Amino acid sequence: RACGREGDDITSRLFLPNDFMRVDADYAAKQSGDWVPGDWPRTYQSPAYPNIFAAGIAFAPPHPISVPHTSPNGTLIAPAPPRTGMPSAEIGKTVARSIADMIGGADRPTRTASMAEMGAACVASAGAHLLTGTAASMTVYPIVPDFERYPRYGRDLNQTFGEIGLAGHWIKILLHHMFLYKAQLRPGWALIPE
């Protein structure tokens, strides 16, 4: 439950029924064929409360990123976009910079980070041994399919791929140590990507 200054219930103005925050997305009910990249948020600002933002897992996606399906036993499969890791970091930096600019005098968010315009990379490692481990490595661009720019698949296939193998496991180990280095703000930490 969210309360306003006077103690009034503002939950429905701030959140959708799924308890994720309503932001600058288009939440109108649409058929999957009518979904467009412009449905997705760009600033992550609450339309009701301009001083509130929701980055990463906190914002409510306007819809799944692909057509929902049902498994043979009736389980709904409705893929949602990745809102942790790399996308969260980019969105968080964008929101933080907009807030800093607004503190400095801007009257609205100055930065944008639409998931329909950004890519993501993920490495899921299995096993701990340096020579026998394996990993699934994948990239996707854009995160939210854009059938206007990429009519056949909704994504740029030159920048969207996946691979399973030992090299991905080594990348995961390297990234693990780089992110710990970055988290400790060691020299050159800002050069390490999200």
What is each stretch, according to the model?
Residues R1-S88:
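FAD-site-proximal beta/loop scaffold in flavoenzymes
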Residues T84-P87, I91-E194:
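C-terminal, flexible cofactor-proximal segment of oxidoreductases
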